[in-house]
Amino acid sequence: MLPDWISLDCAAPSESHRQAAMARQAQLTKPLGALGRLEEVAVELAALQATDHPGADRAPVVLFAGDHGIAAQGVSAYPPEVTVQMLRNFAGGGAAIAVLARHLNCPLEVVDVGTLASDAVPGVVADKTRRGTRDFSVAQALTPEEVAFACDAGRRALARQADHQPQLVIFGEMGIGNTTSAAAIAAALLSCAPVDIVGSGTGLDADGRAKKAAVIVAALARHGLTSDAAVADILAAVGGFEIIAMAGAMIAAAQRRWPVLVDGFIVSVAALAAVRLNPSCRTWLLFSHRSAERGHALVLDALGAHPLIDLDLRLGEASGAATALPIIRLACALHNGMATFAEAAVSGRDA
């Protein structure tokens, strides 16, 4: 059973602020639409933040980590112990997202929601009920109670960001085997063939991708995940702690009226699950980039999402969202800082 709060409605964006932002864009010293997506981003944030001065300076990053029993089937190019090793790298500042967050002045919190770590990792918040999921090729990955716990862990992590007074939030993930879990979730939610979704993940070759797809096909059949399967059942059968925590965190963010800048394939699968669980959260999700992972385009299409950038990224860790953040900040700076035709004494189009 999922927590009751999961289904609580999320507020709608402010239409009055959207209209005001659109009117301001029409008055700025440029042809209307000349700044393309930058104008759209500023207008959308103004509506989401219910403000005349949208911004993205306060943008905490929360990275959720978990291990996956399915890694025992050889679906990753890296061994499971890498997850815990990377926890230390995140906390020590040497991982890509740590560098990006530091450069962007974004607070970074790393949360262990289900890794194999038996001891506390300095600088990492531990909020878990189990060390790793079960191998979903032979058993359910999670119990319903563990799914609910992961949702709540995501909400708790989100609540800890309140002191930062977020203008938007970013979620990332780490977990050896999690592209397999994400692909299985996406295949079940979208009723797609796994071969159309499975990508290279951490660097699999063609044979590795074929093996990963076959593992997912067998698992979906084993668990009876047909097109009418409930989202909660899909998450329990083939999900991961960090993926479910992100879905919960997204819904909780939307319920607080905090926009979410969504990262790549795995985070987008969490977003798809979140939207299926609570459709009213969709409007609070902004999409940062199109990943090189094969299945990402299908997930984005299902969400009606139009990401800002496409740099062939496939690292995860929220690295794509962090890379897109400066574009959002610039969009807000232009919206807030440009002069109107009247202020600059420049003749408008109809003059």
From Swiss-Prot:
User: Which Enzyme Commission number(s) are on file for it?
Assistant: 2.4.2.21
Tell me a Gene Ontology molecular-function term this record carries: nicotinate-nucleotide-dimethylbenzimidazole phosphoribosyltransferase activity
What residues sit in the active site?
A: 317 (proton acceptor)
Biological processes per GO annotation:
cobalamin biosynthetic process
Keyword list, A-Z: Cobalamin biosynthesis, Glycosyltransferase, Transferase
Does the keyword field hold ATP-binding? no
Q: Please list the reactions this protein catalyses.
A: 5,6-dimethylbenzimidazole + nicotinate beta-D-ribonucleotide = alpha-ribazole 5'-phosphate + nicotinate + H(+)
The answer on whether this UniProt entry bears the keyword Transferase reads yes
Matching entries from Gene3D superfamilies are given as: 1.10.1610.10, 3.40.50.10210
Q: In which pathway does it act?
A: Nucleoside biosynthesis; alpha-ribazole biosynthesis; alpha-ribazole from 5,6-dimethylbenzimidazole: step 1/2
Q: Which EC class is this protein assigned?
A: transferase
Q: Where is the signal peptide?
A: none
State its role: Catalyzes the synthesis of alpha-ribazole-5'-phosphate from nicotinate mononucleotide (NAMN) and 5,6-dimethylbenzimidazole (DMB).
Family note = Belongs to the CobT family.
This chain belongs to which protein, by name?
Nicotinate-nucleotide--dimethylbenzimidazole phosphoribosyltransferase
What species is this protein from?
A: Bradyrhizobium sp. (strain BTAi1 / ATCC BAA-1182)
Q: What is the lineage of its organism?
A: Bacteria, Pseudomonadati, Pseudomonadota, Alphaproteobacteria, Hyphomicrobiales
Write the gene name: cobT
